[in-house]
UniProtKB/Swiss-Prot annotation:
Belongs to the RraA family. It comes from Psychromonas ingrahamii (strain DSM 17664 / CCUG 51855 / 37). This is Regulator of ribonuclease activity A. One of its GO terms (molecular function) is enzyme binding. Its main location: cytoplasm. Homotrimer. Binds to both RNA-binding sites in the C-terminal region of Rne and to RhlB. Keywords: Cytoplasm.
Length: 170
């Protein structure tokens, strides 16, 4: 399904929070949405692997990597695991790597930028706790909507199915 964050913002202006425009698309799917699962970690991918081994149908993994630009928190293997387990997307306050492989996968991935250096495989951090970056506090079970224009979050699901790419707000 295609989500149009611009139209969703117009319709639900009083309901949604808009994430500051700091992130770029890296996955093969530019538009995605789902229930937020949060991870807070710094230059470590162990908790990310653990989370993505679970069924991710209808979910988006939101990783607060502290904005680190020194190590990538998502690589092709991690993204493939997410696809295999049905995750809708991954949003990273940090870096990704292997971008040519990521763009071929049927998953939404947004991150600050790319770097070739991988992160450590330790399980240090927090799972399903509130995280704050890009001007927004993300809570577990928030609903995240993303497209090429940006990312918004809502405490409740929005009626996005009523929207199409050709819809316009008067």
């Amino acid at each position: 399904m295609h989500y149009n964050t611009s139209l969703l913002c117009d319709i639900y202006a009083d309901t949604v929070d808009v994430v500051e425009p700091l992130l770029t698309n890296f996955g093969g799917r530019n538009s995605f949405a789902g229930e937020v699962v949060t991870i807070k970690c710094f230059e470590s991918v162990g908790l990310i692997y653990k989370a993505l081994e679970e069924n991710g149908l209808g979910k988006v993994l939101l990783v607060d990597g502290g904005g680190s630009l020194r190590r990538a928190l998502v690589n092709a293997h991690i993204a493939e695991l997410a696809v295999e387990n049905g995750w809708e997307g991954i949003v990273v306050n940090g870096c990704v790597r292997e971008v040519d492989l990521l763009e071929d996968l049927d998953i939404g991935i947004q991150a600050i930028t790319a770097i070739p250096v991988g992160a450590e495989d330790t399980q240090i951090g927090e799972v399903n706790s509130p995280v704050n970056f890009a001007g927004v506090t993300f809570l577990p079970e928030d609903i995240l909507y993303a497209d090429s224009t940006g990312i918004i979050i809502s405490p409740e699901p929005l009626n996005a199915e009523a929207l199409t790419e050709s819809d316009e707000i008067a």
